[in-house]
Structures are given as C-alpha cells and as structure tokens.
Amino acid sequence: MTRPVALITGGGRGIGAATAKRLAADGYDVLLTYNTSSKPAEMVVDEIRERGDDALAVKVDCANTGEVGLLGIHPWMARGIDVLVLNHGAYDRVAASDMSMEDLRRTMLVNFEGAVAVWKAVQVHLTPHARIVAVGSQLGTRGSPHGADYSASKAALATWARSLAQAVGPEGKRVNILAPGFVDTDILAKDTPEKRKERELQVPLKRVGTPEDMAHTISFLVGNNSSYITGAIIHVNGGLYLP
C-alpha cells in the first residue's frame, strides 16, 4: 500500500525537523523543504531513511515565487499531498518603534506571503481530506515590542488560515494553526544562561518547550483524533500565555 505524503516547509531544523521525524514514524512519506543549508535537512532525511521510512529534502526559498512554483511540479506531487505543514519562517529582532517598512515587507514576504504561495502552488495536489497546519506564534496574538513585524506576519498567517478553514471545510479539508510559546530552536539559540533561566521562570510548567512538544501536537492535528477540529489556534506554551 502506498504511504500518504506529508509536505513540510522549513523541515530541516527545529520544529520542522521534529515534525518530519514524527510524521514519518506515524506512517507518512515526508517531503521537506529547506532554504539556507542543505546539511541539516539531509541529516533529517538520513535519520528517517535509517528507520526504514522514506523522505526527501528539496531546496525552496518560500519567498521566491519561482522556487515555490517548482515545488508545485515536483514529482512527488503526483502522489497527492495528504498533509501540509507550513512551518518556514524568519524572525529578526527589531524594536517595534524602530521597525522600518523594509523590515515589515521582508518578514511578511517570507512568513505570510510565502505560506500563501506554497498553498497556491500545491493546492491542486491536495487529497480530498487533506490536513493543513500553519505554524504561527503566540506573538501573533499578543504582539511583541521586539518583533512587531514578526508578530504581524504571524497574525496575518493565523487569520488567513482560519479563513481558509472556512473555505475548504465543505470539501472535507481541515486547517489549524499551532501557536508555540518559547521553544528551544534557533530563535532562542543566542540566549545567555541568565536569559534562558528567565524564560523558564516565566512559564508555569518551568521549562522551555521542545521541538518534539510541537511535533506531537501537529501529529494530533493531522490525525483522526482531531477530525472535528478546524480553524483552531492551538496555543502550546506551557501556560506562558493564556488567551
């Protein structure tokens, strides 16, 4: 029997890499994209293949319409896409009061327009009951003085995804949004030990989240046990932010 296919953007590291491994273990063949570095993505692919599952990494800059267009005609598309995880993103820390229009345009192009572009490119290849997860952020709801452009892009992503959920629900497709809090990814890589401790103390569960925490939630959102959930923003943050 042919295994279902999961497409994960930004699948070479962090939440994307953990999700690729989890969905492969769940029974999916995984097509993941990367942009700046092939090595981490290939390591994820190798790990998945060593377990006897199948995966493939392809270079796609989601802000580049040409590269996104090529993704839309990738040979794996002929199999149909059962799961789409829009996980790619960029976060440059810029004080809200100092944010330039160029900062905003650049971040929106990657985080929001890039996600919509990927959706448009693969839309015709989605299976009738496809499940889509957009990886947003708690900052898309609460905002941030250190990342207004990022917060705005994630707010736009979430609102678009909720609109999409209403549009494609009658077709049998589901769309949900994962909104992580603090997660141990590249975004927090420059934390000093003091800053890390400060973050942990802010979280009621007293720890920073892991990429695997997020991957487990995505696995649930694309699985049968969430079959009546669509258009939801799922906050996974250890109690840090309670909207």
Predicted regions: what is each one?
Residues 119, 153, 161:
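Active-site helix of classical SDR
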Residues 137:
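Residue(s) in the substrate-gating loop at a strand-loop-helix junction
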Residues 169, 174, 229-231, 237:
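Short, small/polar-rich loop/turn modules that mediate ligand/substrate recognition or access, typified
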Residues 12-13:
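Conserved glycine-rich cofactor-binding loop
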Residues 124-125, 166-170, 227:
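Alpha-helical segment proximal to the catalytic Tyr-Lys
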Residues 28-42:
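Conserved glycine-rich Rossmann-like NAD(P)H-binding loop of the short-chain dehydrogenase/reductase
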